Amino acid sequence: MFVAKNLSPERESKRQKKEPEIMEPSFPLLSPNNCGHWYIRYGFCIVCKSTVDKTIEGRVFDGLHLSSEALALTKRLITKFSCLNMKKLHLVLDLDLTLIHSVRVPCLSEAEKYLIEEAGSTTREDLWKMKVRGDPISITIEHLVKLRPFLCEFLKEANEMFTMYVYTKGTRPYAEAILKLIDPKKLYFGHRVITRNESPHTKTLDMVLADERGVVIVDDTRKAWPNNKSNLVLIGRYNYFRSQSRVLKPHSEEKTDESENNGGLANVLKLLKGIHHKFFKVEEEVESQDVRLTMSVVENFSSEPKAKRRKIEPTINESSSSLSSSSSCGHWYICHGICIGCKSTVKKSQGRAFDYIFDGLQLSHEAVALTKCFTTKLSCLNEKKLHLVLDLDHTLLHTVMVPSLSQAEKYLIEEAGSATRDDLWKIKAVGDPMEFLTKLRPFLRDFLKEANEFFTMYVYTKGSRVYAKQVLELIDPKKLYFGDRVITKTESPHMKTLDFVLAEERGVVIVDDTRNVWPDHKSNLVDISKYSYFRLKGQDSMPYSEEKTDESESEGGLANVLKLLKEVHQRFFRVEEELESKDVRSLLQEIDFELNVESVE
C-alpha cells in the first residue's frame, strides 16, 4: 500500500469518494452536412458523431482514422511543436542490418554454434536468444540477435535530438521481441513502431506523424524508400552472421566485430548531429528549414564511402488541406491571423491564442479539443507519459528581492552562485536595476529528472515571461524538461486554467502550493506545502535562511509529491487495455480517500 503523509495540507479529514464530472468536448459549429470528418474513431466522426464510410481517404492509427486533410495538418503541427518546443527532429530507423543482425538458430554454421551458449551470458551483453511466434502462430522460431556495436550509445544520444520511430519489414511480434532487448522501458521508441503488418509493401513516410521536412531516415536499403530517397541516410549493412551467399568469413566465425568508434552507427551519429545543428542554427529560420536541403549540403552525409550524391532539391507536396475552401473550412489552425487550411484571414475571436508554443499560433475551440485528445493518446500509447503542470514560486523555488533581505540574511548575497552553493543564485533582468536571489527547493533537480520519465512537463507561473525565462535558465538550461512549455501571466493574467495545456484533463496532474488559483481544476490538483526559505513579511518565526537550515531533502515537499506522482502513473498504466478510460482525477481521489482512511485508523 502506498503511504505518504501530509501531501495535501488543505486536505479535509474526511472526504467522500466521488467521480469527478468529466466534460465531453462539444463542437456546436459543425453538423454532418458541413463537417469534413477529419478525425474518425471506429467508424464514427469525433466531431459530428455521424457514421463515416471506411473507404474515405486517409490513414488509420490504432483505431483513429485521420482524413488526408487532418493527416497533413497534424503532421505540420506535430513538427512545429517538436521543432519549436523540444528542438527535436524525427528519426526513422530500420532494424535488420541497420541496428541489429538476427539469424534463426537452425541456420547457424557449424563454426557459429558456440554463440548459442554465449547468448545472454554475463560475458555477452550484445548477443541474445529470443523466441518469436511464427506463421502460423502455433510455430515458435528461435533466433540469435546480435546488437550492432555502439547501438546503446547511439540511441541514447540520438534521443536527445530526435523523436524516434522503428520501421521494419519484419512482423510486429518480431519487432516487439527485438525492442524488448534494445528499449525495454520504451524510453526511445515508445509505441512508434511500424511493421509489415501496417506497411506490407514499400516503406513510406505517410505512416510517420511528422512533416517530411523534419524527418531523417536511416536504412541500409535505398530501394525500400522509393518516394523518400531525399530523406534517406544510407548506412553500411551490418552482417555479423554467415549469409548463404557470403564467401568471406563473417565476424561471427572470425570472432571479431565492426569498429565501435568508426563503425556504421558512430559515423551516422556524427552526421545526424551535423544535420540537427545546421537545422537549428538560426532559430528565426527553423520554420523554413528542410532536412532534405540540409542533408544535401552537409559533406559526406552518406556513411558509405563510395556513395556519391548530387544535391537534391526535394519535391515538396502541398498539403491536401488546400482542398478546403474558405466557405467549408472550419479554420481550426491559424497562424498570424491566416488559416493554415484555406489561407483566408480569421478573426482572433474565433479561437484561442497559443503564443507560448510559437508566435502567432491560434487554435479554434474544435482544434483545441481534438489536439488535446490526440496529444494525450499519443503521449499515453507512445511514451507512457502523462502531463504535469508545475508552479514555480513556493513550489519549486523561492525568490526574493535583494533589498528585502533581513540583516541576518545578507550573508547569502556572497554565497549566491559560489562554488559552495549550487542551490542559490542571483538573477537580474536586462535593463532592470532590481536584483533577486533565487533559492531552489531541496530535491528539485532529482525531482525534475525522475518526473521527466513519467510526465511531459509544463511550467505555469503568475510571474512574467522574463522572470520565468531567467529561472528556467537555472533549473532547465538545455530545455530537457520543459522545452518551451511555459505559461506566464502574459498569456494567463487572471486565474490559472488547463485550457492552455494541450492535453486532455483526464491525463493532467497539477502541482501547486496555492489551491484557489485553480478554481476550475481542483480535482487535478496535488497541493504541495509552501516552500519559504527567506523571511516573509510579518513572519514571527526564524526562516531557514536565518537558521542556516533547510527543508528535508528526502522527506520534504518535492520528495513526497514525487512518491504520489509515481503512484498515480503506476495506477494509470497498470492495465494497458484500460488506458482510454483512465482518469487521473479519479485516481487522485482514490489515493486521497485511502490516505484519509489510514489516517483515521
Swiss-Prot record:
The organs and tissues expressing this protein are described as: Expressed in roots, seedlings, hypocotyls, cotyledons, leaves, siliques and flowers.
InterPro entries assigned? Fcp1, FCP1_dom, FCP1_euk, HAD-like_sf, HAD_sf
Instruction: Give the Gene Ontology MF terms in alphabetical order.
Output: RNA polymerase II CTD heptapeptide repeat phosphatase activity
Disrupted gene: resulting phenotype?
A: Weak abscisic acid (ABA) hyposensitivity during the early stages of seedling development. Slighty decreased drought stress tolerance.
Among Pfam families, the record links this protein to: NIF
Q: Which reaction does it catalyse?
A: O-phospho-L-seryl-[protein] + H2O = L-seryl-[protein] + phosphate; O-phospho-L-threonyl-[protein] + H2O = L-threonyl-[protein] + phosphate
List all Basic and acidic residues biased stretches: 8-20
Q: Which CDD domains match?
A: HAD_FCP1-like
Function according to Swiss-Prot or TrEMBL = Mediates the dephosphorylation of 'Ser-2' of the heptad repeats YSPTSPS in the C-terminal domain of the largest RNA polymerase II subunit (RPB1). This promotes the activity of RNA polymerase II. Positively regulates abscisic acid (ABA) and drought responses, including the regulation of specific genes expression.
Q: What is this protein called?
A: RNA polymerase II C-terminal domain phosphatase-like 5
Organism of provenance: Arabidopsis thaliana
The gene behind this protein is: CPL5
